[in-house]
């Protein structure tokens, strides 16, 4: 069987402590057709889910307030800092501390990840469409609530909790859809869907300032609420999952996955990637100011970073389908670290920093472009929802604490970003090394399945034949290649 003929495979699953090996028939994924409609809908949802912080940031240009605020809220991106400056300058929430404001931004991200098991359970009980519509309702309510906020706890409820929960239901409900519709083009489809986040950030960063200037902040939020409701509801209604066709487990917390070392490797890869990604995303515009650039130039750098992500994710997906998803994911993550160490470290001019924002943006968000395809490659489509649900829970820690870590590094170095850049670069490289180890495991698994099927390893589809170690039927005398050899050998996985 070739890599692109994912029609049949062997899958071993655990039930009540017993391992059962069964043959999985092809689920008839069309590799096109209505699947592209679902990809477009997922990209649109991602644009709305992740545009929020970009929108928050282009509200006003109060540089003297922003300069003070940035010293206290380094963890939030400069865009969000400007939004907070709007509240402070207008004395809307007197007595509210800088830390209170800073916590709101991180709260929404952590709540989106924490709610993932609930969203997975909702999908299993009521279906994907219901899960997405719950997210639409929560996100719409959050925008409307923010438009009427007059006390700090209103912001915690609207921008922190409510928006975070809505983001979680929308993201969890849509993140695995693209992978269900494709086999040979799975990574390309997921890359296009993931590109919506970067494209949405770019579009809304350009549109938000005009809305605030012409209609005011409250009505800007209300207009966003209306648009979000209409657009996301439309996407929720046209998205179709294939959970029944593939027999998706949809378990919120399948603890048995933690017994698999390859799954633990994926968790470490995501953990380290997010430590680096959040620091890069939130610090690049601020870094521009520390090397003598204006606030406007810093905002441009942030917008270009989003553009780079939108441009980079589809090509990463496309080449992943040709050269291997694990190969591309580990290589691109390594490049993200390398670019940070050799370009960002020495970027002191606007032109060089824009160049880094473009090339760094291409690879910085590799995890989001490959999360579903790589997890499918390792765990299989059946366990994909459960594996992703656990992944989002694990990512609560790095997305919550990477900001304070970066803040402490910058403060310890007297305001210099050298330490933060080193931290970012080496976390990316460490993540790439861990995933390269998972890749070596996968090569051994492919060798074993090839031996069972009586084929060469290059003829085995690494997705269709998702099996755990120790499956029966291995020919007598068969041994996998040594692990160290698998680390350096070439195999499309």
Give the predicted meaning of each segment.
Residues 1-45, 50, 217-252, 377, ...:
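Intracellular terminal tails of multi-pass secondary transporters
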Residues 291-293, 297, 303-309, 320-374, ...:
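C-terminal transmembrane helical hairpin of 12-TM major facilitator-type secondary transporters
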Residues 137-150, 236, 334-348:
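C-terminal ends and interior cores of transmembrane alpha-helices
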Residues 48, 52-58, 76-87, 260-318, ...:
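Extracytoplasmic gate region of multi-pass secondary transporters
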Residues 47, 67-69, 139-143, 152-173, ...:
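Hydrophobic core of transmembrane alpha-helices in multi-pass small-molecule transporters
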Residues 114-154, 320:
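Conserved MFS/SLC helix-loop-helix module at the cytosolic interface between two early adjacent transmembrane helices
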Residues 87, 160, 167-183, 189-190, ...:
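Intracellular juxtamembrane helix-capping segments at the cytosolic ends
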Residues 63-64, 87-92, 122-123, 203-216, ...:
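Interfacial helix-cap and linker-helix signal at transmembrane-aqueous boundaries
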């Amino acid at each position: 069987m070739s890599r692109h003929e994912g029609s049949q495979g062997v899958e071993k699953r655990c039930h009540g402590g017993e391992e059962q090996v069964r043959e999985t028939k092809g689920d008839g994924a069309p590799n096109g057709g209505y699947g592209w409609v679902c990809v477009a809908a997922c990209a649109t949802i991602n644009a709305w889910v992740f545009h929020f912080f970009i929108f928050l940031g282009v509200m006003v240009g109060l540089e003297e307030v922003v300069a003070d605020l940035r010293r206290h809220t380094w963890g939030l991106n400069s865009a969000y800092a400007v939004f907070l400056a709007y509240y402070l300058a207008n004395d809307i929430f007197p007595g509210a501390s800088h830390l209170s404001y800073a916590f709101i931004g991180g709260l929404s991200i952590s709540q989106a990840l924490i709610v993932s098991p609930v969203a997975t359970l909702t999908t299993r009980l009521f279906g994907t469409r219901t899960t997405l519509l719950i997210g639409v309702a929560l996100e719409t309510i959050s925008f409307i609530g923010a438009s009427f906020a007059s006390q700090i706890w209103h912001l915690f409820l609207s921008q922190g909790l409510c928006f975070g929960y809505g983001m979680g239901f929308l993201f969890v409900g849509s993140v695995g859809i693209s992978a269900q519709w494709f086999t040979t083009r799975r990574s390309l489809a997921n890359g296009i869907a993931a590109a919506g986040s970067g494209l949405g950030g770019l579009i809304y960063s350009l549109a938000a300032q005009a809305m605030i200037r012409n209609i005011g902040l409250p009505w800007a939020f209300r207009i966003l609420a209306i648009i979000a409701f209409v657009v996301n509801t439309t996407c929720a209604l046209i998205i179709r999952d294939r959970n029944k066709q593939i027999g998706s487990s949809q378990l919120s917390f399948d603890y048995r996955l933690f017994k698999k070392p390859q799954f633990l490797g994926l968790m470490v890869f995501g953990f380290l990637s997010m430590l680096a990604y959040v620091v890069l995303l939130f610090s690049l515009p601020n870094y521009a100011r520390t090397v003598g650039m204006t606030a406007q130039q810093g905002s441009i750098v942030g917008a270009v970073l989003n553009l780079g992500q939108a441009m980079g994710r589809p090509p990463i997906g496309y080449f992943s389908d040709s050269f291997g998803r694990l190969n591309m994911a580990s290589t691109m993550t390594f490049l993200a670290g390398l670019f940070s160490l050799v370009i960002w470290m020495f970027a002191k001019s606007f032109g060089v920093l824009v160049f880094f924002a473009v090339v760094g943006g291409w690879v910085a968000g590799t995890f989001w472009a490959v999360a579903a395809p790589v997890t499918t490659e390792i765990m299989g489509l059946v366990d994909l929802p459960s594996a992703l649900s656990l992944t989002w829970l694990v990512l609560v820690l790095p997305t919550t604490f990477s900001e304070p870590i970066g803040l402490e590094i910058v403060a310890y170095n007297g305001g210099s970003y050298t330490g933060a850049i080193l931290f970012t670069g080496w976390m990316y490289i460490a993540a790439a090394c861990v995933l390269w180890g998972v890749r070596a495991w996968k090569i051994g698994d492919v060798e074993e399945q090839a031996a069972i099927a009586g084929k060469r390893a290059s003829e085995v589809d690494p997705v269709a034949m998702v099996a755990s170690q120790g499956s029966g039927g291995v020919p007598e005398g068969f041994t996998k290649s040594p692990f160290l050899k698998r680390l350096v050998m070439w195999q499309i996985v």
